[in-house]
Amino acid sequence: MNNIYCIRHGWSDHNEAFLKSDYDEKVFESKKYKKSRLTEKGIIQARLLNDNWDEKNNIDIILCSPMERCLDTANIIFGNNCEINVLECLREFPAGLHWCNYRSSLVELVQSYPNIKTIDVPNEYIDSYFDPKKFESRNNLKKRVNKFKNYLKSYNNKNIAVISHCQFLSEFLNKDFESIKHCYPYKINF
């Protein structure tokens, strides 16, 4: 049995724009928010978790989405010297049409985050997701979550931090997505 701590990334550019637009989903389709990054508010959220979450010192493994906002959140919570294991299956839903969910290439990620220990992502982002006829379905998300659950079975008696996104964590935790807070460690046993 593992202790899994699921953490949504800190507040990001696209979250702020969505709020300011009175919740207009067209924000997510704007290239202005491509590779959405943490805002000052998101940085503060991650620092507060770093300062106030005692369990962070007991984490054995950090699993993280390949999105910069998640990697930055992990580095703030656990320090820039922490070893991060990056998994493509932890990215946000939907992959496609939402530019804020576009990620850097494998080469860019490794260059920008030298503390990545392992990385399980294709070299290039799957551009076909940005074809309106091919973007990721809810069923694809469920398959990713199941793949991740199977992956977690390879660990035993570990404390694992999972840094991911609202929709992915909502599906994984079986919680309403609107209840998933930024930089809050939801603990489950798995």
Language model features with spans:
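Short, solvent-exposed loop/turn segments at secondary-structure junctions
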Residues: 10-13, 67-70, 90-92, 126, ...
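GST-like fold's C-terminal all-alpha helical module
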Residues: 141-145, 149-153, 160-165
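Beta-strand elements within well-structured catalytic alpha/beta cores of enzymes
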Residues: 3-7, 63, 158-168
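Phosphate-handling substructures
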Residues: 13-37, 79-144
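Acidic, low-complexity terminal tails and accessory targeting/binding regions
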Residues: 1-4, 16-17, 22, 92-115, ...
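Conserved anionic group-binding/transfer micro-motifs
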Residues: 42-46, 62, 109, 141-142, ...
